[in-house]
A protein has these predicted regions:
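Helix-loop-helix
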Residues: 50-57, 146, 150-164, 234-308, ...
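An intracellular "coupling" helix at the cytosolic face of ABC transporter transmembrane type-1 domains
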Residues: 13-16, 104-105, 121-130, 134, ...
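Transmembrane helices of ABC transporter permease
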Residues: 13, 17-30, 41, 65, ...
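Alpha-helical transmembrane segments of multi-pass integral membrane proteins
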Residues: 24-28, 61-69, 73, 81-85, ...
Length: 584
């Protein structure tokens, strides 16, 4: 319940709608509770005395009450809808804002599909708590208390028979809720898995088609979908038991009331109209209990969803800007001082171990190594996407932990392995680097990245629309746009994380020549191809998370066995053209 209470704080400006909705429900309930009294009078006075005028009068009054109950019910629906959808929007905004603050290590705690489910399905479950649950939770107790009170007022003896059944219903409700609560949590977890499979399959649909793996993906989806179906069936198998259980108990009570009431009518101590009115109250109380039972089941599922949402909102941000953090990066120098790093504190092995590396401002550094050598891990410590486990990382001579995060990351441009572009125009995507960039600055960055070659062929140029992920561009085109976007940021340090792998060697050479003109910018190039780093001031060889050697291409080619092996394999593998061209 604490999670629900906490999320209730996001209702904010919609409290007025909630209060008005509750008022409408209470007025609606009052009108409905008056009707059984009118029915009793209509039978005992109007019908018994054959008084048509009285019957018409009471019938008209009952119609007015029913109409007013309908109007107040419709008004409630309007207020509840506004409150529930507004509340849901506020929660989604809070979740999304929180996720945008996450560091990479925070994101490691959640699957992307799970975060999507928590912002959509789980929020919808909470919205249903208001849409479907607020009315009965307000109306149910009112009907229950007033119904029992009025039934005692009409006939205390019959009311006692009915009242005895209430604890039995409470026990049934408790047992069902206790059984179903953990099943709802499991159900939402399977929804996460289903979303993950769908997202993965749709995102990689081109690879699925290329490798003719459609049947395999269908089988994988069917397996998870079947799990969801079975889990849903099991959950609702127990959840729906409340209806037959309640019906058995309550209809047994009604039979007893009719038996006792019939005997009382025969003895003359009870009128037919009073018994009819009493039974109307009994049915209203039964409905109230059913409403409360359904609300408890809805609340049970909502508690599971609220807990999942709270996990997102309560996730402790691992990386935060310090108070009064340094706002300006002096230069592009980078220093690693006895740096070690592991992704999880409980991990036995370090991804990086005892790294000592000093890069002067304006230098161009190449980083090579085998798969899993921790090349990407190394550079992710510079803009503080992760914090070093041991040791110190400095940028511009200052510990990265002392910087304001926004200031640090604005000074460090990083072009990731995966080229991320968004739906919208090419211009909009490039302006991520500099929102205020004019066309002249944008085109200059595109020329440096050799993106102007294909942009000039597009009829709409910078206004060309990109689909999600930029999938209407080739891999090389996307890489060049990502490079141009990073250049627009005018960062002091520019990191290329294997970000020219999709362009041909001739284009890569052009890009390097243009980048060489940016002498005041420190450039760190992670690459698989020797030709990508052969021109750099120094080359760092990483092996199993440790610095194996540092030197120029010529030095390493003479002295280092690992570098010689990489060079020889690429000469045999068809990269010799690029390497020879660089050495000419």
């Amino acid at each position: 319940m604490n999670d629900i209470k906490r999320l209730a704080g996001y209702i904010g400006s919609y409290k007025k709608d909630m209060m008005l909705g509750a008022l409408m429900v209470m007025i609606e309930t009052a009108f409905e509770l008056v009707i059984p009294i009118m029915i009793a009078d209509l039978i005992d006075v109007g019908v018994a005395n054959h008084d048509l005028a009285y019957i018409y009068s009471k019938g008209f009054q009952m119609g007015i009450c029913a109409l007013l109950a309908l109007v107040t019910g419709l008004l409630y629906a309007r207020f509840a809808a506004r409150a529930s959808y507004g509340w849901g929007a506020k929660i989604r905004e809070a979740e999304y804002a929180k996720v945008m603050q996450y560091s990479f290590s925070n994101l490691d705690h959640f699957d992307t599909s799970s975060l999507i489910t928590r912002m959509t399905t789980d929020v919808t479950v909470l919205q249903n708590l208001i849409n479907s649950g607020f009315r009965p939770v307000t109306r149910g107790p009112s009907l229950l208390i007033l119904g029992i009170g009025l039934s005692f007022w009409m006939n205390p003896k019959l009311a006692i028979v009915f009242l005895v059944c209430t604890p039995v219903l409470g026990i049934v409700l408790f047992l069902i809720v206790r059984k179903v609560a953990p099943m709802y949590t499991k159900l939402q977890t399977i929804v996460d898995r289903l979303n993950h499979v769908v997202q993965e399959g749709v995102t990689a649909i081109r690879a699925v088609k290329a490798f003719v793996r459609g049947e395999y993906e269908e089988e994988k989806f069917d397996a998870v979908n079947t799990d969801l179906s079975v889990s849903s069936e099991q959950t609702f198998h127990y959840a729906v038991l409340n209806l037959p259980a309640f019906q058995v108990v309550m209809y047994s009570a009604i039979v007893l009331i009719m038996w006792f009431g019939g005997n009382m009518i025969l003895s003359g101590s009870l009128k037919v109209g009073d018994l009819t009115g009493f039974l109307s109250y009994v049915m209203q109380v039964v409905n109230a209990l059913m409403m409360i039972a359904n609300v408890f089941l809805l609340l049970t599922r909502s508690l599971a969803s609220a807990h999942r949402i709270a996990e997102v909102l309560d996730e402790r941000i691992v990386l935060k800007s310090p108070e009064n953090g340094v706002q300006k990066v002096k230069d592009g120098s980078v220093d690693f001082e006895q740096v070690s790093f592991k992704y999880h504190k409980d991990a036995k092995a370090y991804a990086l171990s005892d790294v000592d590396l000093h890069i002067k401002a304006g230098q161009t550094i190449g980083v090579v190594g085998g798969t899993g050598a921790a090349k990407t891990t190394l550079v992710q410590l510079i803009p503080r996407l992760y914090d070093a486990t041991c040791g110190t990382v400095r940028v511009g001579g200052v510990d990265v932990k002392a910087y304001d995060l926004h200031a640090l990351r604005a000074a460090v441009g990083i072009i990731l392995q995966k080229n991320e572009l968004f739906s919208g125009t090419i211009r909009d995507n490039l302006k991520w680097g500099d929102p205020d960039a004019d066309d002249e600055k944008i085109w200059h960055a595109c020329r440096v990245a050799c993106a102007d070659e294909f942009l000039e062929r597009f009829p709409d140029g910078l206004d060309t629309m990109l689909v999600q992920g930029g999938n209407n561009l080739s891999g090389g085109q996307k890489q060049r746009l990502c490079i141009a976007r990073a250049l627009l940021a005018s960062a002091k340090i520019l990191i290329f994380d294997d970000s020219t792998s999709a362009v041909d060697t001739a284009t890569e050479k052009k890009i390097r020549k243009e980048l060489a003109k940016l002498g005041d910018m420190t450039k760190i190039i992670i690459a698989q191809r020797i030709s990508s780093v052969i021109h750099t001031d120094r080359i760092v060889i990483l092996d199993d998370g440790k610095i194996h050697n540092i030197g120029t291409h010529e030095q390493l080619l003479k002295e280092d066995a690992i570098y010689q092996e990489i060079y020889a394999s690429q000469m045999k593998g068809g990269n010799s053209d690029g390497i020879e061209n660089e050495e000419c």
